């Protein structure tokens, strides 16, 4: 494919800072090559990389400057499509661009994250503080004001970038601004009074963390939780309706029994049945009535059958169905959003001389801004991979794959099949035999047998251990035998496959890690290093290798590994809810729970602490539930986790209620409902991921789901010379052409006319979804095209009514 070196003019031009149209280039171009009248709206005066068509600095009126502006704007559009940013937040002038670039770099993201974490961690030092971390009021209030000032600076940069109108339209930013104002007022009041007051609004500090760029997964989770709420609330109301009906019925049936405290009042009936829904008080809640009338058990059996086994499972089914629909709609929305972003970028990259596609010159300019760390060789390989028709220009159809292809990592394909192919014949035969051995089924099943025997041996050894010191000062012979076998296996695989191929497998990395830890455990036993004895306990991890034997187990484990990043964001989402409830709990319930605090309640024994003499010794009877308190943020987190597990959670609730009022139960019940929502979403997410993978495997039985995506491209020597000549004419010697020079020198050294490169990347769920919904995707594209055509007609009909100044255009007119 030839590389064009001639100059051209952008079909769409952006404006300079003053808002005027750029001057026509004085290069002898004809009228058809002059800039069009529908140019852009801002200029870029701080471009770090000059255009390929210029040897150095270019004036604002030159074609090179116009291209540089278009390159950066096109790159911004691609980033907005990738990050799912709305196009109405696109920078509209030079000042907005400067603020946009400042707000979209990792230093700014780290500043956002550090500020949010500082505000959250201040709860460790503010009253009620963790004893070891307590700070003076002046110190923590000053730190809070400093962090809030940083947030003000962040919002000012966003205001400069977005403009006042767009800033007000951005809901999350307005919520963050409102919380910032409240936090500012409270911090100043604390600093002036030198005294902390009730600050429930500290629970809203989480918004600063949620708004961070690095917490995009948390924002998606929260959005899905809110989107799943309508059907969830419908089933929840049905659940509460039956609960109230049964509470009224239970009150009339069991309140005459004076020994039954669970149904003495209607309030107690509702609370008892709410707790019964979690099974935390069963069968205790049934026993007083059951002792008087055995038929009373029917009431509780029917209630649990309806509420726990039917409605709760119905709740999960409804949320799962809603979650599936949300995931599909989210994929469709993001897919069309990316497609629109690509169309915006494409319109900025085509030229007046070549409106049919993007030349390599324009593509290279785009990639300098979109992927600045990508080398010149990788840019050209990306262009080649996109160019399906092998023509000098990229069509819009080819350019639609930019996100998938730009993520590939390129490496030269080795001519030899194995790492040892160039060794002397004797060594080659030895290593080839080892390669055949480690790839054979017999070797693999032998290692599975060794792992199984090792597991049984560890189990027998554990059964034979008695209490006390579990670690002998002498190294067991079985440990040496199995570790030797694993070490030999590791050596054979590295020798037969080569270090690179060996470490490219996730299972091999796991085997290597477990073997290394087993060796460290051997050293800990041999050298009597007691603090490191815990490493020995990791030996049973080898048993996980047995899961590779069955395909279903492999699918489960692969799904689990795929879910880990998303599960981390879901865990962080749950921690955010924990933080908010912990702050509220500290403000209302701090210091009210202590030993012997609840002697008048039904759970007094759980909080009782007393000692008495039995014979000649003193016996201490201690109820440990007083440790479940809200005296500081750490204790609150532990207490909330115990409430999440729900075992005996009502004891904590009743202990707090006995010291405050019955309204305190609303806090605990609300927390249970919120955690039930989050946990249901987590379960629905796991089910959706597993079911999706199973359906994909059934639909695409011949495809390799786990192999990742690989693309192969060949570069000829003539192409390399042309690309290098292009770079020399444009910028002279440049560091990003080093790999191109290395490739060319390698071709000359081995007298090759071409070289093959492999592009690899891991397969994402988006890739699986593209294949899973490929029939529907074409319908989505057609529907999207019809909507764009309708918008284009509306824009053209409204154009005469509102005359635009010459050379100006709105963002929405870039691509309709």
Curated annotation (Swiss-Prot):
InterPro entries: Ion_trans_dom, TPC1_animal, Volt_channel_dom_sf
GO biological process: endocytosis involved in viral entry into host cell; monoatomic ion transmembrane transport; positive regulation of autophagy
Catalytic activity line of the entry: Na(+)(in) = Na(+)(out); Ca(2+)(in) = Ca(2+)(out)
Activity regulation note: Na(+) current is inhibited by ATP in a MTORC-dependent manner. ATP sensitivity is independent of PI(3,5)P2. Probably regulated by Mg(2+) ions, cytosolic Mg(2+) selectively inhibits outward current while lysosomal Mg(2+) modestly inhibits both the outward and inward currents. In the absence of Mg(2+), NAADP readily activates TPCN2, with properties similar to PI(3,5)P2. Both current elicited by PI(3,5)P2 as well as NAADP are inhibited by tetrandrine.
Glycosylation sites: 599, 611, 616
Region annotated Disordered, chain positions: 17-64, 782-816
The organism's place on the tree of life at top rank: Eukaryota
All ranges on the Extracellular side of the membrane: 134, 199-200, 256-262, 287-294, 466-479, 527-534, 595-629, 654-670
Protein's membrane topology: Multi-pass membrane protein
GO MF, one example: identical protein binding
Extent of Low complexity compositional bias: 50-63, 791-816
Keyword Manganese: no
Record-level GO cellular component terms: early endosome membrane; endolysosome; endosome; endosome membrane; lysosomal membrane; lysosome; monoatomic ion channel complex; recycling endosome membrane
SUPFAM superfamilies the UniProt entry points to: Voltage-gated potassium channels
Protein name: Two pore channel protein 1
Tissue expression summary: Highest expression found in the heart and kidney, and lowest expression found in the spleen.
Source organism of this protein record: Homo sapiens
Job of this protein: Intracellular channel initially characterized as a non-selective Ca(2+)-permeable channel activated by NAADP (nicotinic acid adenine dinucleotide phosphate), it is also a voltage-gated highly-selective Na(+) channel activated directly by PI(3,5)P2 (phosphatidylinositol 3,5-bisphosphate) that senses pH changes and confers electrical excitability to organelles. Localizes to the early and recycling endosomes membranes where it plays a role in the uptake and processing of proteins and regulates organellar membrane excitability, membrane trafficking and pH homeostasis.
Keyword set includes Ribosomal protein: no
Cytoplasmic side: 1-112, 156-177, 221-234, 316-444, 501-503, 550-573, 692-816
Residues forming coiled coils: 769-796
Post-translational modification: N-glycosylated.
Main location per the UniProt record: membrane
Transmembrane segments: 113-133, 135-155, 178-198, 201-220, 235-255, 295-315, 445-465, 480-500, 504-526, 535-549, 574-594, 671-691
């Amino acid at each position: 494919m030839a590389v064009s070196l001639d100059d051209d003019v952008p079909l769409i031009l952006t404006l300079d800072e003053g808002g005027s149209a750029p001057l026509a280039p004085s290069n002898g171009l004809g009228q058809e090559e002059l800039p069009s009248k529908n140019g852009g709206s801002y200029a870029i005066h701080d471009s770090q990389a000059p255009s390929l068509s210029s040897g150095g600095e270019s004036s604002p009126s030159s074609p090179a400057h116009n291209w540089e502006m278009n390159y950066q704007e096109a790159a911004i559009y691609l980033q907005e499509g990738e990050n799912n940013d709305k196009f109405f937040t696109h920078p509209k002038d030079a000042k907005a661009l400067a603020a946009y670039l400042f707000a979209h770099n990792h230093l700014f993201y780290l500043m956002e994250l550090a500020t949010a974490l500082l505000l959250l961690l201040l709860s460790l030092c503010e009253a009620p503080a963790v004893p070891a971390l307590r700070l003076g009021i002046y110190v923590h209030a000053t730190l809070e004001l400093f962090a809030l000032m940083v947030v003000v600076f962040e919002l000012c940069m966003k205001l400069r970038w977005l403009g006042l109108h767009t800033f007000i339209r951005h809901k999350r930013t307005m919520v963050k601004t409102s919380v910032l104002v409240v936090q500012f007022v409270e911090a100043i009041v604390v600093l002036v009074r030198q005294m902390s007051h009730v600050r429930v609004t500290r629970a809203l500090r989480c918004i600063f963390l949620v708004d961070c760029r690095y917490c995009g997964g948390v924002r998606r989770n929260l959005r899905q939780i809110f989107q799943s709420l309508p059907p969830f609330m419908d089933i929840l109301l049905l659940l509460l309706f039956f609960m109230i009906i049964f509470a009224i019925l239970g009150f009339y049936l069991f309140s005459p029994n004076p020994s039954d405290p669970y149904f003495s009042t209607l309030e107690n009936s509702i609370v008892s049945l709410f707790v019964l829904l979690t099974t935390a008080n069963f069968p205790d809640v049934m026993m007083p009535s059951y002792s008087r009338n055995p038929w009373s058990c029917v009431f509780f059996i029917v209630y649990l059958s309806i509420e726990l086994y039917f409605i709760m499972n119905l709740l999960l089914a409804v949320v799962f169905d809603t979650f599936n629909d949300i995931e599909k709609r989210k994929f469709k929305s993001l897919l069309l959003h990316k497609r629109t972003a690509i169309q915006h970028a494409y319109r900025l990259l085509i030229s007046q001389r070549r409106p049919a596609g993007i030349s390599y010159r324009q593509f290279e300019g785009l990639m300098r801004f979109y992927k600045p760390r990508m080398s010149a060789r990788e840019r050209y390989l990306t262009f080649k991979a996109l160019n399906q028709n092998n023509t000098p220009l990229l069509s819009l159809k080819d350019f639609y794959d930019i996100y998938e292809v730009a993520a590939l990592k390129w490496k030269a394909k080795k001519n030899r099949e194995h790492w040892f192919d160039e060794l002397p014949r004797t060594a080659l035969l030895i290593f080839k035999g080892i390669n055949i051995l480690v790839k054979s089924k017999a070797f693999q099943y032998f290692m599975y047998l060794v792992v199984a025997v090792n597991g049984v041996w560890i189990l027998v050894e554990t059964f034979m251990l008695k209490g006390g010191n579990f670690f002998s000062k002498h190294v067991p012979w079985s440990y040496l035998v199995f570790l030797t076998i694993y070490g030999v296996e590791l050596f054979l695989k590295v020798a037969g496959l080569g270090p690179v191929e060996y470490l490219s497998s996730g299972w091999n990395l796991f085997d290597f890690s477990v073997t290394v830890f087993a060796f460290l455990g051997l050293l800990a036993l041999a050298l009597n290093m007691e603090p490191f004895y815990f490493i020995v306990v990791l030996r049973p991890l080898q048993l996980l290798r047995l899961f590779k034997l069955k395909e279903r187990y492999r699918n489960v484990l692969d799904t689990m590994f795929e879910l880990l990043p998303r599960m981390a964001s879901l865990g962080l989402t749950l921690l955010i809810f924990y933080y908010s409830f912990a702050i509220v709990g500290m403000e209302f319930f701090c210091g009210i729970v202590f030993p012997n605090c609840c002697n008048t309640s039904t759970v007094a024994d759980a909080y009782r602490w007393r000692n008495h003499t039995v014979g000649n010794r003193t016996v201490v009877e201690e109820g440990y539930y007083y440790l479940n308190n809200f005296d500081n943020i750490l204790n609150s987190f532990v207490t909330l986790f115990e409430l999440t597990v729900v075992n005996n959670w009502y004891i904590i609730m009743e202990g707090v209620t006995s010291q405050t009022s019955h309204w305190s139960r609303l806090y605990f019940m609300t927390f249970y409902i919120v955690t039930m929502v989050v946990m249901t979403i987590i379960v629905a997410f796991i089910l959706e991921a597993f079911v999706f993978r199973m359906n994909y495997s059934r639909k695409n039985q011949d495809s390799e789901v786990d192999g990742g995506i690989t693309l192969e491209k060949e570069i000829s020597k003539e192409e390399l010379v042309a690309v290098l000549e292009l770079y020399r004419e444009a910028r002279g010697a440049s560091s990003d052409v080093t790999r191109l020079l290395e490739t060319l020198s390698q071709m000359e050294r081995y007298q090759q006319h071409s070289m093959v490169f492999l592009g690899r990347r891991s397969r994402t769920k988006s890739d699986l979804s593209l294949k899973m919904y490929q029939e529907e995707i074409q319908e989505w594209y057609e529907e999207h095209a019809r909507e764009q055509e309708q918008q284009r007609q509306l824009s053209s009909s409204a154009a005469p009514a509102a005359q635009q100044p010459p050379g100006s255009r709105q963002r929405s007119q870039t691509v309709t």
